[in-house]
Amino acid sequence: MHRYFSLAGRTALVTGGSRGIGRMIAQGLLEAGARVFICGRDGAACEATAAELSQYGECIGLAADLSGEVGARALAVELNKRIEQLDILVNNAGTSWGAPLESYPVKGWEKVMQLNVTAVFSCIQQLLPLLRKSGNEQNPARVINIGSVAGISSMSEEAYAYGPSKAALHQLSRNLARELVGEHINVNVIAPGRFPSKMTRFISNDEAAMAADVALIPMKRWGREEEMSALAITLCSAAGAYMTGAIIPIDGGFTL
């Protein structure tokens, strides 16, 4: 691997890293040489995924419920027992909720906003001391927040809270990028379009729905796992050291 993209000696945390986009990113960071912690509410699933990913490098699974501030604080306590500094934080954990507009529940709205925005803020807040220990002018610490093209476009698919939550996350990320750049912490957003995941399985398992969905994408296909991994590696390595505050769609041209 070219030195511009090497993550040798770096330590990363990927929330929601046991499946989907989180797993894609975790594998990519491992392949680039990083030591990677993955966390999620299902500790057994995280440990199982970590065992599978350990063929690519050192991967550790942790149980962490990030739906509230208490969980973020507990995760920070656990990491402080294990590491001296955190070089890379990928906030991938999130959720969605779909229902017709007339019956869309307030509890669904609040859950999506809590997990997709507030929990990310709490996680960054609690892990900031470890990130500060890492960042320097030559090699800043990196925070990647996983947004969505739903936060850029206006297609809601009856997931009325999801797009607004991701738009809020995009703006929060820009605010934090400005706030933390002087402390050598870069904050960027990856805004995925369609990639294989549990959240998109209802489309990929339906041949007609898949054909209709792909027709909306200029490249006429969904994203591949290695394409997500490669973008994350770029942002976390020397290749992305001069980037902060960016909202990067990876969507096959969907938002053009």
Predicted regions and their residues:
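Short, small/polar-rich loop/turn modules that mediate ligand/substrate recognition or access, typified
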Residues: 181, 186, 243-245
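Conserved glycine-rich cofactor-binding loop
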Residues: 18-19, 42
